[in-house]
Amino acid sequence: MLSFSHLSLADGVPIYQQILRYVKLGIAGGTIAHGEELPSRRVVSALLGVNPNTVQKAYRLLEEEGLILSHTGAKSTVVADEAAQSRVRGELLQAEVRDTIAAMK
C-alpha cells in the first residue's frame, strides 16, 4: 500500500500538488503499478490532516490525465500503461528542467 505520510503541509507546496507528484513519480519509476489501488480519499486526508476535498482534487486531476480510474464507493485504481509511464517521465523531466533554469536566474 502506498504511504503518503512523508508529505507535509509545511513544505510550501500545496498538498494536492504533492500528492500528484508522489503518484506520478511512482508511476514513472515503476513503484506504482498498473492495477494498484490507491488508498481512499478519507484515509489519505486523515493521515495528512487535510480536508478530503483536497485529496479529491488530486485524484480528480490524476483521473483527468488518464492515470487512475475512480468509481463511486470503490478505491481508485492506477491504469497507467507503458505509454502513460513514458508521458509522465517526460512531464517530470520538463518540470525539473524548468525548475533548474528558474533557480539559476
Region locations from a protein language model:
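Extreme N-terminal segment that seeds HTH/winged-HTH DNA-binding domains in transcriptional regulators
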Residues: 1-37, 43, 84, 88-105
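A short alpha-helical element within helix-turn-helix/winged-helix DNA-binding domains
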Residues: 37-48, 62
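Alpha-helical DNA-recognition elements
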Residues: 25, 57, 61
